[in-house]
Amino acid sequence: MDFMNENQAAHGDREYGHMVTRMGIERKVVVGHWSDENVQNRIGSWMRTAIGIIESSHIRVMRVADNMRNVAVTEGDKVEAQLKFGWEVDAYPVNEIAACVDAVTEPDINALVDEYYDKYEILLEGRDAGEFKKHVAVQAQIEIGFERFLKEKNYHAIVTHFGDLGCLKQLPGLAIQRLMEKGYGFGA
């Protein structure tokens, strides 16, 4: 029976290949025995690409503010992104997101700052340690506020720019790097 199943799979694979060729559908074809490491690597590469395409088809992008004034390359084409890739790109006033940042509590900020200091080597050469820690706390507050906003609105990526900080006290540098580490997409 196993031998027959193998032959049936081969027959079905050929039938499928013939059908999609007639339909003009481009596809990836990997040939070889499943146990061959090269075949496994090629199939694995294809699978990762397929996952990326599927995941990309329903991305929701949050723009902090909208376009940077007088800088054409920041425009992008939100409609084309929706049509071509299926991405939803929404812009929010920076102060609406800043309100979410301002709502972060001191204990939450302190806990994340402690995590930063445990996880990263903080170089303080020539800097006042207490003053520097205050700046780090601002990044922690931004990270928490942005992440809460992203989760609440079900966004997968964020776009920021330095042309409009609104009520934010700093550019979201470390905060954005940490969001990327957590799997959020980022563009500027």
Give residue ranges: language-model regions:
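An N-terminal assembly and electron-transfer interface module characteristic of large anaerobic redox
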Residues: M1-A188
